[in-house]
Amino acid sequence: MDQAQHVHFVGIGGYGMSAIARVLIDLGYKVTGSDVAMNDLAKKLEARGAVIHIGHNAAHVEGADSIVYSTSISKDNPEVIAGQALGIPVMHRSQMLARILNERTGVAVAGAHGKTTTTSMISHVLEECGVDPTFIIGGELMSAGTNAKAGTSDYVIAEADESDGSFLEYRPMYEIVTSIEPDHLEHFDGDFNNLKQAYVQFLSHLKPDGKAILCIDDSHVREVMPSVEKTVVTYAVDPNFVAQAQFSATSIECGDRCSTCQVYHKDERLGELCLVVPGKHNIANALAAIVVCLDIGLSFDKIAQALSTFSGAKRRFQIIGDARGVLVVDDYAHHPTEIIATLSGARASGRRVIAVFQPQRYTRTYFLMDEFSRAFAEADEVIITDIYSPAGEEKIEGVTSEVLVQKIRTNSHPRAQYIPTKEQMQEHVFKELQEGDLVLTMGAGDIWKSAYWLAEKLEK
């Protein structure tokens, strides 16, 4: 990286921005930043020496050698404008991450689903096996208590965000694609083919001896695979595709809070894998981690042992409370495929599943309305709250939670309910709870607060 000593982050409180800021602090850089409010991530950075400003002001960038902004920051932000006027290099978050990732042995994890968990699994295994990686995660690695760290080894593990095409900045040694879905299409002219082509470009940016690690359970991954000109390593958990995959999992058993399987490399049985994070989708995520860690030089036995202690990433089927016989779980699932996978994991518990979903963004709800309406069949009870939308997003006529509930009733769950506010929903759910229930809150907004409210109420 360039030896710019003072880096200022505009919008420092997000997971992606705060992770990069944390790594730079660990590397000895002076870090300042601003955001509209102070949150836990910003407080942790402040405790490590960062100077955090609340609100955006041109004066905040004085003395900075570089300015980093996130996708959510508008072009007319006063700090961005001031930086440009002063001749300070101004770059997108992905460009700063590329500086960290591209100069070392990088592992970039992309895909519509499973990025955070897969990145976390690889980071956890390397940590447990003494490799000491740098990791930059879009969520908190529970075992480390942080979303980022600068390690002493040459390995950098990071999420590669496809949502705005910024993953094209990276030149890693390993690229993982867990899945491809028609999400974030507002950044791709509403055309899914443009997004798929972006993945092909991403996979062409590997280092010359790099490897593309692809989940062939996913039909869209299989579709783009013939266009990949780099070395390809495939993995699968779907019985329809395990015979075609180089790495596979069979004899899968998913229980209340664990999953087990047998792992194979082609026809060779590598051994048994036991995870304390439930769901078949987590076995797929673990397979991707196994492929990378084996290639790095770790033995399967060491990898499996490390994965057996992986407790998960924050907001990824995270158990918030367990009281009065009721399990309260929160998950970041905000896409139909993620909802289906998360509900499948919940269903394996054998409990009555009460699913509470807070849609996020009018654009996503518009593009995926039909898919959302078909995603809730595995739940016993379904409650939909109002759409959570970031500031500045315009409403779309006809795109409401009421409309979504009507479609869910037709396509996957006839008893789906619309309860507008979190407060109303919380009181309703609490009154309906029975011993043996599993309450599952899902969404990318602030629905997680309801999980904590319910857990605290149950413990009183």
Swiss-Prot record:
It holds the Pfam family Mur_ligase_M. One of its GO terms (cellular component) is cytoplasm. This is UDP-N-acetylmuramate--L-alanine ligase. It catalyses: UDP-N-acetyl-alpha-D-muramate + L-alanine + ATP = UDP-N-acetyl-alpha-D-muramoyl-L-alanine + ADP + phosphate + H(+). ATP binds at G111, A112, H113, G114, K115, T116, T117. Its EC number is 6.3.2.8. Cell wall formation. GO terms for molecular function: ATP binding; UDP-N-acetylmuramate-L-alanine ligase activity. InterPro entries: Mur-like_cat_sf (IPR036565), Mur_ligase_C (IPR004101), Mur_ligase_C_dom_sf (IPR036615), Mur_ligase_cen (IPR013221), Mur_ligase_N (IPR000713), MurCDEF_pg_biosynth (IPR050061), UDP-N-AcMur_Ala_ligase_MurC (IPR005758).
